[in-house]
Amino acid sequence: MKSVQNDMTVGSPMKMILSFTFPIFLGNVFQQFYNMADAVIVGKFVGTKALAAVGSTGTIMFLIYGFVVGMTAGFTVLTAQKFGAGDMQGMRRTVAGAGILSFLIGLFLTVTFMLFMKPLLHLMHTPSDIFADAYKYIMIVSGGILAQMLYNLLSSILRALGNSKIPLYFLIISALLNIVLDLVLIIVFQMGAPGAAIATVVAQGISGVLCLIYIMWKIPLLHLKKEDWHVGGQIYAIQLKIGLPMALQYSITAIGTMMVQSALNILGSTLVAAFTAASKIEQVVTQAYVAMGTTMATYGAQNIGAGNVPRIRQGFKACTILGIGYSLVAATFIMTVGKYMTYLFVSEDVDIIMSSVDIYLKCIGFFFIPLAIVNIYRNGIQGLGYGLLPMMAGVAKLIGRGVVALIAAKERSYLGVCLASPAAWVLAGGLLIAMYYYIMNVHMKKMFGDYNQKA
């Protein structure tokens, strides 16, 4: 079993975090290639307006994707805790419970988004010259929510057992497939933005199926028996208690980004295209923070399950050092050469769009350290079993992002739009650090006594 699971309760915390984070980072980057491939190929072969159409739905895609990722990660926190405690039967029941809940909620999300998508696009002031393509694109993505759910649930289960490499391998395969499908559907069949959406959904579905095949073939520990499906109300309740706040936290963030997108849409399709290109660059560079957060959720869950609180402290410290170091490198890169990646996305109005891309990348680069703090501490705290506290940080992000977005909309300011996310990161990061110190210095001592005296 050593090849398919990883015990994070022993060994060097820094080494463990690095070895676990790197495959997740690569996997997340390849997952971003789904959307980046769409944007690059659409922008190059269809045009700037088509790129703006895809980009104008980016915040809605983040709402969908974020809800799915947050929920499935939350459902499997209990899986990691049971695994860390050595309760294998309980662990399998949490897997069954997560599967049932994910299917039902995924079905509900699919119907809801498809029913209300057109009013939502109107509410966001989507420019009329890109509305039709934007609507077709996001409707196809909404129809593929269960495909997203399948991959993210199974990859979260594998990560709960300490396996972050297998999801990466399947993501690489599906990312390459997505690019091939993009080229065929957009260039050969001239399907435009809808073709890009179809390619994305198909590739995501295949990555999920590959994860399922691997689990059935290689991991007997996850082969569910009839009795494992007798989940029980207590497991469902705990999974919903952790999973829904994590999903809602992403949703709160997405609502804030939708406010930013609405303010941006007022400025016209050219700036929407520029912001889209800049956001794609940002998303690739910042996937390291998402990976660190995912690692800390698993690390925290396994170690709290094992009752090893001093090791939890060590892990937070190690990951914070890692996050700060990466931030310095990433900020230097994105603020100096990031703008030249604009050439990947557009062939027309390049000078205007590149200038706008550069403004955005420089605005966010100064605030990468707060972004690292947000991801590490939010997910780490959730891994310890605290679902509601990090959601308060999500509210802080919404307030920071929303206030700046409203001002930007009123002033019709592109710079204001660019500063909305940094404002959210600073507010949420400060709040999460305060929460962490409260949990470790007050609540954990009540639970475990003077744990500092333990090994």
Predicted feature descriptions by range:
Residues S19-D38, I140, Y151, S174, ...:
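Transmembrane helical elements of multi-pass membrane transporters/channels
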Residues M8-F45, T59-G74, L78, F103-T110, ...:
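N-terminal transmembrane alpha-helices
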Residues L63, N178-L183, G208-L212, V284-Q287, ...:
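Hydrophobic transmembrane alpha-helices of multi-pass small-molecule transporters
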Residues M1-T21, T79-G144, V188-L244, G300-F367, ...:
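Short alpha-helical transmembrane segments in multi-pass integral membrane proteins
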Residues T72, V141-R159, P167-A175, A196-C211, ...:
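Short runs within selected transmembrane alpha-helices of multi-pass transporters and secretion channels
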Residues V42-F62, S128-D133, A193-P194, I235-I242, ...:
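Interfacial/gating helices of multi-pass transporter permease domains
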Residues L51-V111, Q148-P167, A274-G338, L371-A393:
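Small-residue-rich hydrophobic transmembrane alpha-helices
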Residues F33-L51, L121-S128, V184-M191, S251-K280, ...:
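Helix-terminus/linker motif at the lipid-water interface of multi-pass membrane proteins
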